[in-house]
Amino acid sequence: VLTHEMGHAFADYVGEREIKWLSNVTPSMEGAETHSMSMEFLTSPWHRLFFAEDTAKYQLSHAEDALIFLPYGTMVDHFQEIVYSNPDMTPDERNAEWTRLEKIYRPYIDFDSLPFYSRGAGWQRQLHIYLYPFYYIDYCMAQTVALEFFALHLNDPEDAWRRYLDFVKLGGTKTFVGLVKSVGLKTPLEKGSIGPIVEELGKWIEKNNI
């Protein structure tokens, strides 16, 4: 949480000094979340100061959780698209739809012994569905770019940081797609953009498995 929020704080600090117009300091939600999620990974050389002998365990768990989050976050957005397109759905129909999506996005999870989840009510624990409709997909797009920064960091930490700093300095002067392309990265909207990132991270996870 600390490095995540520090990413937001750092972006504000830099933006207020680099960008003339205050209205252009903060980017869209997915851009802002890229600041924070990327900082979680780019601070990895200092993770030992937090976790000491458990640093390797944390870094492995962090990378795995980031990858696992992508199908779940996408499922949340897919569910909202269906629900908002069909406002007359009954509670049972919504639960049935969530169950169907679980089998598509997370078929490896067995909910049979968990009544709340097995009846398809798991979507109710996701606060964003109630309070921040359609915000969750922003996390997915930001996480994808953050993982791209992490993949760069594994091979060339200085280049990864330089691109990240350039990304931050642009603040909200460009769209999310414009920001990502400006620093030479692929956007999550490009076909085939996620595959190479997952492959790179998969190799790292296998190499650092505990």
Show where each model-derived region lies.
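C-terminal, non-catalytic "cap/extension" segments appended to globular domains
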Residues: 2, 10, 38, 49, ...
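Single, functionally critical "micro-switch" positions that shape active/binding sites
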Residues: 3, 7, 32
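Catalytic Zn2+-binding segment of zinc metalloproteases
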Residues: 7-21
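Post-HExxH zinc-binding segment in Zn-dependent metallohydrolases
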Residues: 15, 26-54, 63, 68, ...
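Short, glycine/acidic-rich hinge or "gate" loops at secondary-structure transitions
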Residues: 18-25, 48-59, 156-163
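Alpha-helix N-cap/helix-initiation motif
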Residues: 21-32, 131, 135
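Active-site-adjacent structural elements in folded domains
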Residues: 22-23, 61-66, 126-130
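An alpha-helix initiation/capping motif
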Residues: 29-33, 57, 61, 92-99
